Amino acid sequence: MQFHFKVADAERDRDNVAATSNAAANPHAALQPQQPVALVEPKDAQHEIRLQNIVATFSVNCELDLKAINSRTRNSEYSPKRFRGVIMRMHSPRCTALIFRTGKVICTGARNEIEADIGSRKFARILQKLGFPVKFMEYKLQNIVATVDLRFPIRLENLNHVHGQFSSYEPEMFPGLIYRMVKPRIVLLIFVNGKVVFTGAKSRKDIMDCLEAISPILLSFRKT
């Protein structure tokens, strides 16, 4: 199987990294399919990876007056009894900031890395315009959420039975199988219809490396 990021995202990706194989150092590689696969996808089959959410954090390196921020800005809310930070929303790029008194900020909702960076810097600029001695520091991508449709059904019960050391599956509580990848450290939500959600990735390379490791495993548990 071959994978690629959605074109609109790939064109804006700074790194544009390709997948690399780490089978020798990957504990998942030792788990082989128990039986041969009857149906094998063509090698040129393409699967589009879609970025759904980027979470980034940064610091403005100063203490913030949250009441003043809320009263002097639009598209913000502050209810300290419910949440101890200011929630500020931005329309372009579409993202949300969680702003804390310590100067720590969480930016979430961006659809790619560039939007996360631009949105974070715009939020810092807004705080600077309010008179705070802002320094944009410690910017870091914390979580990339992505999805892919493998376009084949998966036998989740069998997968959980063989890979129980990495997975948990309780269909009465949640319809997907939770698979905890060790290298790279990513959590996958795998559904019977072949849809997969990736959470916890730090880069696109993490997602591609994860797919490199997990796709042969999932293909071996394909429903026939």
From Swiss-Prot:
Q: What is its main location?
A: nucleus
Where does the record place Low complexity bias?
Answer: 17-34
Q: Which GO terms describe its biological process?
A: DNA-templated transcription initiation; embryo development ending in birth or egg hatching; transcription by RNA polymerase II; transcription by RNA polymerase III; transcription initiation at RNA polymerase II promoter; transcription initiation at RNA polymerase III promoter; tRNA transcription by RNA polymerase III
Describe, from its UniProt entry, the tissues in which this protein is expressed: Primary spermatocytes in the adult testis and in a subset of cells in the dorsal medial region of the embryonic CNS.
Q: Which Pfam families match?
A: TBP
Q: Where does the record locate the signal sequence feature? A: none
Q: Which keywords does this chain's UniProt record carry?
A: DNA-binding, Nucleus, Repeat, Transcription, Transcription regulation
Quote the InterPro entries the UniProt record gives.
TBP, TBP_CS, TBP_dom_sf, TBP_eukaryotic
Q: Which GO terms describe its molecular function?
A: DNA binding; general transcription initiation factor activity; RNA polymerase II cis-regulatory region sequence-specific DNA binding; RNA polymerase III general transcription initiation factor binding; RNA polymerase III type 2 promoter sequence-specific DNA binding; TFIIA-class transcription factor complex binding; TFIIB-class transcription factor binding
The record, for PROSITE patterns, names: TFIID
Q: Where are the sequence repeats?
A: 51-127, 141-218
Q: Which domain of life is it from?
A: Eukaryota
Is Nucleus a UniProt keyword of this protein?
yes
Can you say where in the cell this protein is located? Nucleus
A GO CC term assigned to this protein in UniProt? polytene chromosome
* Region Disordered: start-end pairs: 14-34
Q: Do you know which HAMAP family this protein is assigned to?
A: TATA_bind_prot_arch (MF_00408)
| PANTHER family the record matches | TATA-BOX BINDING PROTEIN
UniProt name for this protein: TBP-related factor
- Species whose genome carries this gene: Drosophila melanogaster
This protein's encoding gene: Trf
